[in-house]
A protein has these predicted regions:
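Active-site hotspot residues in diverse enzymes, especially metal/ion-binding acidic/histidine motifs
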Residues: 1-148
Length: 148
């Protein structure tokens, strides 16, 4: 789990993406494009419950940067959701590659909590990954009764 987090910080550094720890009133984490074409990420460490939460937040924000999926406060809900989904999909593919996910299933690791522990992510994030790899989308609310 710690190795995932450290590799994400290294990746950000290699991509010249600033990652700063900042106390924020509302957000837990956020990413922004900078005028010079680079990106910056802010993470509020006081809102992180665990290293897995920090890992998921950083991967998600890197997903925004790597896919260029940004929006402003005036964007309509469907545009926001589209950009959030792109960031989540990037993060899922980075933290839980499909081949490793399939190997975990073949090994008998099928419970969400066990999968989350195996990949060092939060159960909520793992639920999104299962939904993406099973149904091809992130509409977890549509499949929650099935995913259990």
């Amino acid at each position: 789990m710690t190795s995932n987090l450290l590799s994400l910080y290294r990746f950000a550094e290699q991509q010249d993406i600033d990652v700063d720890w900042v106390s924020m009133t509302r957000a837990t984490s956020l990413s922004v494009p900078l005028p010079d074409g680079r990106y910056a990420i802010a993470i509020d460490p006081w809102k992180m419950d665990s290293l897995t939460m920090e890992t998921v937040c950083l991967a998600h924000e890197l997903g925004h940067c790597e896919t260029g999926s940004f929006y402003n406060q005036y964007a309509v809900c469907d545009i926001r959701k589209k950009h959030e989904n792109r960031a989540d999909k990037w993060a899922i593919r980075r933290l839980i590659p499909r081949d490793q996910y399939e190997t975990a299933l073949a090994d008998g690791c099928t419970e969400l909590s066990d999968l989350a522990n195996r990949f060092g992510v939060t159960p909520e994030f793992m639920e999104k990954a299962v939904c993406l790899y099973t149904y091809g989308n992130l509409a977890i609310e549509s499949y929650r009764p099935i995913l259990g």
